[in-house]
């Protein structure tokens, strides 16, 4: 299995390391044609407006959207969640609109307000340590979206078909279970 990690901007190296620990071949994707070489893609945390702008500049935006809409598996964390969402409610910006969620940017506070907490995730036998850094909050979601985890009444891990999104940063932990879940979606 070969998985792509978007290398446009953000903490893509940490996702690459996590996936390699799971024995997966990883390609850092920076060009549209590289999407054809991978079976799924991770979009990391970072700065969502910068990511969108660069994706459009290098013609990755439209190709990625087209692939996702035809069933290509994708996993977005933090800024990646914002990129994949249907709508950003507190900031005017483009998004790919491939998962039926509305998000609020930086809803859990600024960088200094970052925190870790244990959360329950559907299908996991024990709690998961989630790390939130300037995290987006899901304020609404469609009927076809499955909520896999909640923190303080807000969904933090969601799935719609082959799109998985997380408000938190699973790549910053030693726990591989969220990445394993994504890989199970790709198989």
UniProtKB/Swiss-Prot annotation:
InterPro entries in the record: Class_I_gatase-like, PdxT/SNO, PdxT/SNO_CS
Which is an annotated GO molecular function term of this record? glutaminase activity
Residues at which L-glutamine binds: 46-48, 105, 133-134
List the catalytic activities from the record. Answer: aldehydo-D-ribose 5-phosphate + D-glyceraldehyde 3-phosphate + L-glutamine = pyridoxal 5'-phosphate + L-glutamate + phosphate + 3 H2O + H(+); L-glutamine + H2O = L-glutamate + NH4(+)
- Say yes or no: keyword Lyase present: yes
Quote the catalytic residue positions.
Answer: 78 (nucleophile), 169 (charge relay system), 171 (charge relay system)
What is one GO biological process annotated to this record? pyridoxine metabolic process
> What Gene Ontology cellular component terms go with this record?
cytosol; glutaminase complex
Enumerate the UniProt keywords alphabetically. Glutamine amidotransferase, Hydrolase, Lyase, Pyridoxal phosphate
Enumerate the Pfam families for this protein. Answer: SNO
Q: What is its EC number?
A: 4.3.3.6, 3.5.1.2
- Answer yes or no on keyword Transmembrane helix: no
Quote the pathway field.
Cofactor biosynthesis; pyridoxal 5'-phosphate biosynthesis
NCBIfam families registered for this protein in UniProt: PLP_synth_Pdx2, PRK13526.1
Assembly: In the presence of PdxS, forms a dodecamer of heterodimers. Only shows activity in the heterodimer.
Q: Member of which family?
A: Belongs to the glutaminase PdxT/SNO family.
What does the function comment of this entry state?
Catalyzes the hydrolysis of glutamine to glutamate and ammonia as part of the biosynthesis of pyridoxal 5'-phosphate. The resulting ammonia molecule is channeled to the active site of PdxS.
Q: What is this protein called?
A: Pyridoxal 5'-phosphate synthase subunit PdxT
